[in-house]
């Protein structure tokens, strides 16, 4: 466990270096393999949160899934986002991914309060998801030759989540984890479908 924590600290250090950018530099290429690696790490942490929630509360996948009682508007990829195999549009889809990952920052603040003492690296995900958003933002800027700006999100969401009472708060944790797991899994599929090298036409 000690070596894994050390590896995590080193990785976080590299993310902090990239996260201190004021003006986003031009990336030489879209490092989708690195993004997929980070997403797989995120999915692992989400799975560990599910396990911890199941152990502590009995709210488990396939046994008790309370998501239906919540109506929070969380990041989701829909048919209109052009991320499917049919009608795929790289620019539209990447914008959706960037929007979602920037919104994940608030959700991981909530998850850190719920799992920060029992799940390793959940506190790191807040920075990781912001880094994912930055990386996709750079690619969007190259594709569109404009500056992508994240949309304004519901600033009261974190307060509402943290203000929930005991069991309802656990149910909310399950719902948030489910939405994030689905979004991150779809993002991996989307990134795998994008060519490894951005066409030279973007640089002309």
Curated annotation (Swiss-Prot):
User: Its GO CC terms?
Assistant: extracellular space
- GO function terms (MF aspect): cytokine activity; interleukin-6 receptor binding
| Signal peptide residues on this chain, from the entry's feature table | 1-22
Q: Which SUPFAM superfamilies match?
A: 4-helical cytokines
Xref: InterPro entries: 4_helix_cytokine-like_core, IL-6-like, IL-6/GCSF/MGF
Please name the SMART domains in this protein's record. Answer: IL6 (SM00126)
| Keywords, alphabetical | Evasion of host immunity by viral interleukin-like protein, Host-virus interaction, Signal, Viral immunoevasion
A GO BP term here is: immune response
State how it assembles: Interacts with host IL6ST.
According to its UniProt entry, the function of this protein is described as: Initiates signal transduction through binding to interleukin-6 receptor subunit beta IL6ST, independently of the cognate IL6 receptor IL6R. In infected primary effusion lymphoma cells, promotes proliferation of cells, protects them from apoptosis, and promotes immune evasion of interferon activity. Also drives blood to lymphatic endothelial cell differentiation.
UniProt record similarity statement? Belongs to the IL-6 superfamily.
Write down what this protein is called: Viral interleukin-6 homolog
Q: Which organism is it from?
A: Human herpesvirus 8 type P (isolate GK18)
């Amino acid at each position: 466990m000690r070596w894994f924590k050390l590896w995590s600290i080193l990785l976080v250090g590299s993310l902090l270096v990239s996260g201190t950018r004021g003006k986003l530099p031009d990336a030489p290429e879209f490092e989708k393999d690195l993004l997929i690696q980070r997403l797989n790490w995120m999915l692992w942490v989400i799975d560990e949160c599910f396990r911890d929630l199941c152990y502590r509360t009995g709210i488990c996948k396939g046994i008790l899934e309370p998501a239906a009682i919540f109506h929070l508007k969380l990041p989701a990829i829909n048919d209109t986002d052009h991320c499917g195999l049919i009608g795929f549009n790289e620019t539209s889809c990447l914008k959706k991914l960037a929007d979602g990952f920037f919104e994940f920052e608030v959700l991981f603040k909530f998850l850190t309060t719920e799992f920060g003492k029992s799940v390793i690296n959940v506190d790191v995900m807040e920075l990781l998801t912001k880094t994912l958003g930055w990386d996709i933002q750079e690619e969007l800027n190259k594709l569109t030759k404009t500056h992508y700006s994240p949309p304004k999100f519901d600033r009261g969401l974190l307060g509402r989540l943290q203000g929930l009472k005991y069991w309802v708060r656990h149910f909310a944790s399950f719902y948030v984890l489910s939405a994030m797991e689905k979004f991150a899994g779809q993002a991996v599929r989307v990134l795998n479908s994008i060519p490894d090298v951005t066409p030279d036409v973007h640089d002309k």
